C-alpha cells in the first residue's frame, strides 16, 4: 500500500514539474544541429509503467560514436547511468548493479521496468525523423514541424519549442510503447 501511495505521489510531482516548463532556456544553436553531431541535453523525465512511475532529471551527452545518460531521481540521486558505444551498452542502476547488453532498451526494461528508444532518441530531441521511418508514419503541422511519428513500436508525439532560434526542435516529447509512457521536457540543448 505504501509503495502505491508513493507511486501516485511521484506521478503528481512529475506532472507538476512538467507543467512548470514555460521558462525553457534558449537553445545554443539554430536548427543546423543534426543527430550525427555531438550535443548535450538537460531536462526532466517522467515514466509511467505498469502500476509504477518514475520522475526525475535527465542529462545526456551524445556523440555519433557514443552516448552517456544520467537519470536522476526526484531527490537528485542517480537512478541510472547509461553508457552506449560500439561495444554495446552498460546500465548501472541506483543499487550499483551493472547490466551489459547490445540491446539497451531490453536492459532498461529489465533493470528499471521502462525504457527509452535510445537508438533514435538523438533524432527525436532535435525534431528530426530517423532515415528508416517511412513518410506514411510521420505527421507534420502546417509549418512542416514534426508533431508525431511511429517507429519500432514507439508512438512519439512532439510539442514544438516556442523560442525563435529553436528551429524544428521540440520542447517536449511523449513516447508510448506497450504499457510504457515516457515524457521528456527539454530544458537545454547545446552543441558540444
Where are these regions (language model features)?
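Amphipathic hydrophobic-ligand
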Residues: 52-56, 83, 181-183
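Bacterial Sec signal peptide processing site at the extreme N-terminus
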Residues: 15-38
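Sec-dependent bacterial lipoprotein signal peptides
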Residues: 1-23
